[in-house]
Amino acid sequence: MGKISVGINTEYSRSSDKPFEWAVEHAAKMGYKYIEPMVHFGRELMSEAGYFHTVSMFDDPFRIKDACDNAGLTISALQAHGPLGRPEVHGEYIKLAIRTAAEIGAPVVNTDEGLKAKWTTEAEDMVLIKYTLKEASLVAEKRNVKIGLECHAQYSKTPEGLDKLYNLVDSPAIGINLDTGNAYLAGQDVYTWLERVAPRLVHLHAKDISVEHSDKERGKVTGTPVGCACGDGVIDWKRVIDIVKDNTPQDIVFSVECGTPEQAKRSLEHLNNLL
């Protein structure tokens, strides 16, 4: 079986009002070895002003690589979520993210189906998602980049729904990025779902959910941006680790998705102790 490592999604710094470079440097100081940057298409005010962690793909991709290299961090994936069912929004976005990932050595690009258009049927959405995924897979296959499909929205909120998206396109470039917190909040059994997708896993979002958050939203939502510190919530991380160890042949990074630097530090300590 493959090796499990712990990484951090740069969303941990969203509450700090700091730029990407700060998120990278602080992650390294906490002891992380892997990082998952988030990229966006075009320009937006907050990140341009240095108050937010995302990086424009209009920038030189080596802005990402150089910052991570200088901090001694390895990029586990790029987060490039967008609505796969809306090709005019996510088509060029995800293809550029894949090309960016290939240039800087990121092995995975994570995404999901996103919020659907209000006027389309499910059957129409499947055609649109298939189109976007097929186009993206053609770019990814040539560059040895994996596309990590995540459970996050209306169709991927169940094991059957995520598999339906996965099976739309037959490509070695397409895998699964299971988000433990999203799976839990959607009302699913995280562990049986993980067992189901473990052989196809290319990345994992290590998101824990507090009891308070669970009581408020479980079964009512399909996901959440960030969770609490790993070990503070409802997820049994020893069980998650054992499932991946026993069923996933490739190396996997558990990319922590939490809301603050303090939560990120405690998440790393908790997961490392279990590993």
Please identify what each model-predicted range represents.
Residues W22-A28, Y34, P61-N70, T74, ...:
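Active-site acidic/histidine proton-transfer and metal-coordination neighborhood
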Residues S255-K265:
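A short, acidic, flexible beta-alpha connecting loop/helix-capping segment that sits on the rim
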Residues G2-T10, R14, K18, W22-V24, ...:
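Acidic/histidine-rich catalytic cores of soluble enzymes
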Residues Y32, A106, L201, P249-D251:
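A structural motif
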Residues A264-L275:
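C-terminal helical cap(s) of enzyme catalytic domains, especially alpha/beta-barrels
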Residues A49-V55, A123-E124, G223-A229:
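Short glycine-enriched, charge-decorated loop/helix-capping segments at active-site entrances
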Residues Y12-R14, V39-R43, H81-L84, E113-A117, ...:
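Active-site-proximal loop/turn and secondary-structure-junction residues that shape catalytic pockets
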Residues E36-R63, K116-T120:
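Glycine-rich, proline-tolerant flexible connector loops at the mouths of alpha/beta enzymes
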